[in-house]
Amino acid sequence: MLFRSEEIIIPYLSPVDGRWHRYFPDFYVKVRNRQGLIESRILEVKPKSQSVPPKVRGKVTRQYLKEVAAWGVNEAKWKAAEEYCKDRNWKFNVITEEQLGI
């Protein structure tokens, strides 16, 4: 097993400002899967509230607009990470407190 933290850099285009930025995923791991094969994965750990699009709750507030912007940036990062992984035959996962059991 191999474990690295925030060592991979993935470029992504931000929908908020239309500029290119660098995304540093939380973890890169190499593990042996159930079939005994070595598998590479990029893992991002986020609160569940940041891993789903925000819901409109009545009046549009500044907080809601911040949540929409954060969701847009996260979605752009994750799409870039999925492409990065696809090109290398790796897997990309967003992990929340649900998967961690907390």
Regions of interest found by a model, annotated:
Residues M1-I102:
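Electrostatic, structured charged patches in enzyme active sites and in nucleic-acid/phosphate-binding
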